């Protein structure tokens, strides 16, 4: 589907949006009211005031946070049609240096807490099988639920390689059916207890926070917040489906969700004081309000919807990581584009890492009740960080008053949710906070490690090829040096002033000189056009020192050896470089010689070579080098696995250094003798 149609909105775009964006927030009714009942204890404690107040809290939480903050405000803060906390940070980062920590905390928390989303939603749906008499085994054998969830999640993560559009088209109709069904069931139950409609009044929401029937007090907000954890996905997935499609579909989704929450509340009002229900604990009104004849069909539909809920998290994670790589918060990864829309991506490393962590959580907690107790803590941090960045964006647009109002209003509200969610820490929230800290440290080390490295050698980091042309020409013609390669290729990122990293020329000239007939310095630019494939050449006034700028579309193969061979053939044909005849080869005559690609790596132990470096800088720079060495090599990014590649270890600092503490002892002795 074309990006332009996604941005303008269409029926197909809205269907894809239902399948991609709303899975998380759309399946919250599976577990939110269950969590609120667990907070109350036995069902008899869920008095009418408690039930109406709880549903009112859900209604106004969805209204204020999801509708007002995200749909009405955040979706307007798009960065070239992309959303998410990192895209927002890129818009406002020039306003203050400290904002980078806001973005890093928010992004890390979103990635960490998202690992619980697939686990809790799919487990909640599958647990519905426990209530079926014909499937008593799910109650008798506790391992059957996590095993079933594992099989479902592995299948989901496996199909991600097909792309967002394919997955969205498949899931969209199912989510449309899901929302219609849960809204309809909710409406049927509302008719049995119309008093639940009083939940539309915010008075009941405020009263329940301080009511003696609410044993949790303000900490009830920790369970209420589960209703809106998927709100951040609306913003993160904007680049996948377009703002117009989210604007068009959210009113429908919101209405269906509220009808279902009201229906669950109505069922609780009707049954909470009944003899058969008074002392029941850990009951899920979502399934109980469904007629027994439709229970099996609803469990199947809920399981499908729970699978789709995981989709919103997965696509959002891809976008978040892609933006983090672009901002140099994370190492470069292999990113695939299954469609012609650039923002629709697939990152295999993230996909399977997310799968591994999610499955670990499933087997660690095993029940949805345990997962709900841990779910939502880290995401409150993300929402609070998004609010801070949004206030900066509103102020940047010239609305200082509204900026302060947004920061004060939503900042206070989300701080309350954060405080209320702190009780989750001992119940498993420590896991997501631990993941948040780990991801945050990785991003800090990668970003600031590079900044500190550049600080130490920035003055001499870039040197001009023009100043070394004569040496390269002379080396190329020096028969006293063995021929290293016919074509020696460096992936160099040459700037407009013909400057490259000092380490590249150090590799050619300062180490054992690498004689080649032609030296190639390749700069690769990824363009917004999916199948772009063009190049420009600068011979630098020579016949054997060549700059090449290769422009490749984001869907175009990046196997640069194929393109380079065609470029060499073209330059030989127009007599820009000499033919590279060879007497050996399967095909003859052969005019293009061999290629040698050089990939440079650095080692942590090289940090000892700079005695003036601070210890904290050693940690940051060393950490970055370590991360760089365990991530995929450029040889893999550019399809050079089967080419002749030299992976070369180079010094971190190629400029010669001296230790100011070094003393010439002979000179001191002579001076002492003279005295």
From Swiss-Prot:
Disulfide bonds: none annotated. GO terms for cellular component: plasma membrane. It comes from the Bacteria. It catalyses: K(+)(in) + H(+)(in) = K(+)(out) + H(+)(out). GO terms for molecular function: potassium ion transmembrane transporter activity; symporter activity. Belongs to the HAK/KUP transporter (TC 2.A.72) family. Transport of potassium into the cell. Likely operates as a K(+):H(+) symporter. This is Probable potassium transport system protein Kup. The lineage of its organism: Bacteria, Bacillati, Bacillota, Bacilli, Lactobacillales. The gene is kup.
